[in-house]
UniProtKB/Swiss-Prot annotation:
Stored SUPFAM superfamilies: P-loop containing nucleoside triphosphate hydrolases (SSF52540)
Highest taxon listed in the record's lineage: Bacteria
Entry's Gene Ontology molecular function annotations: ATP binding; dethiobiotin synthase activity; magnesium ion binding
The protein, known as: ATP-dependent dethiobiotin synthetase BioD
Active-site residues, as the UniProt record annotates them: 37
Names of required cofactors: Mg(2+)
Listed GO biological process terms: biotin biosynthetic process
Assembly and binders: Homodimer.
Gene behind the chain: bioD
Catalytic reaction equation(s): (7R,8S)-7,8-diammoniononanoate + CO2 + ATP = (4R,5S)-dethiobiotin + ADP + phosphate + 3 H(+)
Length: 226
């Protein structure tokens, strides 16, 4: 079984959009997947669930429950450590790691996706960040970058930090969902040349799950090291 942690260069860069399309591609190809969202914030307009959790469940056509994919959720769409302190909730790396391991050890899966909250160094508390969880799990990362002004710096900084701690970058996805952005290809090419990592997928505004089928197959291939 392959395990992939999905992070963004920032919040609102399309992580959940990418996650749901990967889920749909896996379902279409009969690839057994589970996508976890251990920490979520921001309540949906349509239910009591957090919006990201709701979208993941919808992508699976509700064959999983919220408790099966999410451990900690907050209705306010703010940084997790802020609302956690306000709510007196402890976001423990050990508890998150245990939640994740419990989920995949009980299932026969081809791939486990773990969708993060925001960027690599999103704080869980004043003493721990999301990166601490990734390092504890020691699993590869898929990085989602929304192509816009500033994305080159954000993407390169994230890749450099992953490399510095010997965390494998399984791939990075260019989310090109804003048709008003100029020089999209030039920005992608710059990231590729400076980082040394080829863009795994360039996703347009009208992409659907079919655009993710090849990527989903690559992610579970034996050639990809965990």
């Amino acid at each position: 079984m392959k395990k992939i942690f999905i992070i963004g260069t920032d919040t609102e860069v399309g992580k959940t959009y990418i996650s749901t399309k990967l889920i749909e591609a896996c379902e279409h190809e009969n690839i057994k997947s589970l996508c976890l969202k251990p920490v979520a914030s921001g309540q949906s307009q349509f239910s009591e669930l957090c919006e990201d959790v709701e979208n993941i469940l919808n992508a699976y056509k509700n064959k999983f429950t919220a408790d099966e994919v999410n451990l900690i959720s907050f209705s306010e769409a703010v940084a997790p450590h802020i609302v956690a302190a306000k709510s007196k909730v402890d976001i423990s790396i050990e508890n998150l790691k245990q939640f994740i391991e419990d989920k995949y050890t009980r299932r026969d899966l081809d791939i486990l996706f773990i969708e993060g909250a925001g960027g690599l160094l999103t704080p869980y508390s004043n003493h721990a960040t999301q990166f601490d969880l990734i390092k504890a799990l020691r699993i590869p990362v898929i990085l989602v970058s929304a192509i816009k002004v500033g994305c080159i710096n954000h993407t390169l900084l994230t890749i450099n930090e992953l490399n510095r701690h010997n965390i494998k970058l399984a791939g990075w996805i260019a989310n090109c969902n804003d048709s008003n952005i100029k020089y999209i290809n030039e920005q992608i090419n710059t990231i590729e040349e400076i980082s040394g990592y080829t863009c795994s997928a360039k996703i347009s505004q009208n992409a659907d799950y079919l655009d993710f089928i090849d990527l989903s197959k690559i992610l579970i291939s034996p050639e990809e090291n965990e």
